[in-house]
Amino acid sequence: MQVSNVNDVKIYNLSCGKSLPEWLSDRKKRALQKKDVDVRRRIELIQDFEMPTVSTNIKVSRDGQYIMAAGTYKPRVRCYDTYQLSLKFERCLDAEVVKFDILSEDYSKIVFLQSDRYVELHSQHGRYYRLRIPKFGRDFAYHYPSCDLYFVGASSEVYRLNLEQGRYLNSLQTDASQINVCDINPAHHLFAAGTTEGKVECWDPRTRNRVGLLDCALSSVTADMEVEGLPSVSALKFHGPLHMAVGTSTGQVVLYDLRSNRPLIAKDHQYGLPIKSIQFHSALDLVISADSRIIKMWNKDNGKIFTSIEPEADVNDVCLYPNSGMLFTANEAPKMNVYYIPALGPAPRWCSFLDNLTEELEENPESTVYDDYKFVTRKELDELGLSHLIGSPLLRAYMHGFFMDIRLYHKVKAMVNPFAYEEYKKEKIRQKIEEARAQRVQIKKLPKVNKELALKLYEEEEELSQKKKKQKKMPNILSDDRFKVMFENPDFQVDQESEEYRLLNPLVSKISEKRKKKLKILEKLDAEDGEEEEEPEGKPSDAESSESSDDEKGWVEEVRKQRKLLRQEEKQRRQERVREDQQTALKPQFYEIKAGEEFRSFQDAAKKQKLMRKTLEDRVKVEEKLGTLNVSDTAVGSKQLTFTLKKFEQHRKRQEAEKQHQEERKKLRRSAGHLKSKPARGRPFH
């Protein structure tokens, strides 16, 4: 049993416990239950309360004696007798069950809506009749006064099947394209159908007329919600004559009063998953809504969360046992969960012992690996030398490895490594010796990194400990895990030769000296029993101020000295680099021509002129051979041409002519620099 406490509400998971491997036979399971205490003490409230693979629907009969569940694979329905706490019967079906309902007080009359459009009517002995509906069905509801079954599905029509006459009646035509869910109010028998457009249509079964239309899509959307599409109705449930709860495909539950089109309250599951089931708990005024991930219980008046359940597997259906605190869920897993919440109500009459048992039980988390078997991978099998056992009964394939008996594993492990116990023993002895050493008087060892800083911190700690007055101990950096890396990682080593450290060190040292002096003065003041404002003896305030100014001058001079030294060192390094550059002799660099290339001189102009006289087709062929032209196909199917343009000969000649003309103009120009004007008449003319 697993116990969880959500919002101060205890939830007991009666299905959680040590499970047995599926490959074991019934005889071995019984033998294991006798030997293993954990298996024997686990709580199996109802025997074989599970499905082969997945359970899709679960319901309780109106008399409370029978629990019926549908699942797969293969499609089947199982009936459990609560008085006997065991399986009463099991029936296999031809197709998966979409929805089923119990029409009688016990299990004698059941209707199954299957995924292949068939509807099966079962009696106490088995299948009574089988018929088909025109469209694929998604939900149905039974109207007790008229014995009519209302089927909804992938159609705009609501099909009516009268069980008294044994024939179909006229269908109800809706405005929707498809209908997901339907329900009938037990008080006044109002029929409601939830559509994919996010609307709820209400019909009167007596007149077969629509009496109301409610748009829930806009009501479920709030200001702080992000909705990608139009929400459709995925769940529908009446509560009393006036209230109706609507669940949407985007994860909202909206509560309505039938007299108004405005919602009383809207609750968001915050997961964005379709609401699959809605139940009401009348005693505490709670709404139990469930999507595939979570089951939430909240107050229908103010929306305050009462508690919530998050199963390990996805939820398909939820059933609340009447007048109790027991909850059943159909999951995407073989085991169907049974939850007991004492805050909701007492345990049912057939398991009243739970009230006394839950007080004594403690939380036992479910084990994911069987204790009697060891999970090993193929690599571990190779290391143990057991690869030849693959395929034998000693190894059971599971996921990416195998299950093997734990006793066999220990034997093989001891044979492969016979000294494992000796190594384990030595390790334990070493741990005991280290624990004993820790109790002795320890000498403080300096760390490998930042030894000077650690020594300084040790000295400050000793000075504080030697003081007479007891002060509150400040946390030490050496013992703080946050600064542990600073004394272990060499990357945090303080470089005392760096420029920043040498400039800051005089200032830091002077500040520490001033701090020590102030501490001594404060100690003297505390020791004296004179007046509070009395100055220290033999030390007036003027002398103290003059001393502080002298200290400031001292560290300023020290900083200047360090700056001067740094400049000198930088100058020396530059001179050394220049000297090294002068001493190094530069050697000529040789370049190797690639294989297949030829050295060409500058006398290829004639060849280029001949090439320019040729046609474009001939030039393209020559350029492709030389490699200066690149033609490639693109992904779309076109071609891409890449080439290099060269200057024309005429353009080059024109540039040379312009250059020659400018030089001639410079030679023929006559300068007027020898002409000078008088200073009084203005600037000289140049």
From Swiss-Prot:
What subcellular compartments does it reside in? Nucleus, Nucleolus
Highest rank taxon of the organism: Eukaryota
UniProt keyword list: Coiled coil, Nucleus, Repeat, WD repeat
Q: Can you say where the WD repeats lie in this chain?
A: 50-90, 174-213, 228-266, 270-308, 310-349
Q: Which GO terms describe its cellular component?
A: nucleolus
Entry similarity comment: Belongs to the WD repeat NOL10/ENP2 family.
Identification of the protein by name: Nucleolar protein 10
Organismal lineage: Eukaryota, Metazoa, Chordata, Craniata, Vertebrata
Gene encoding this polypeptide?
nol10
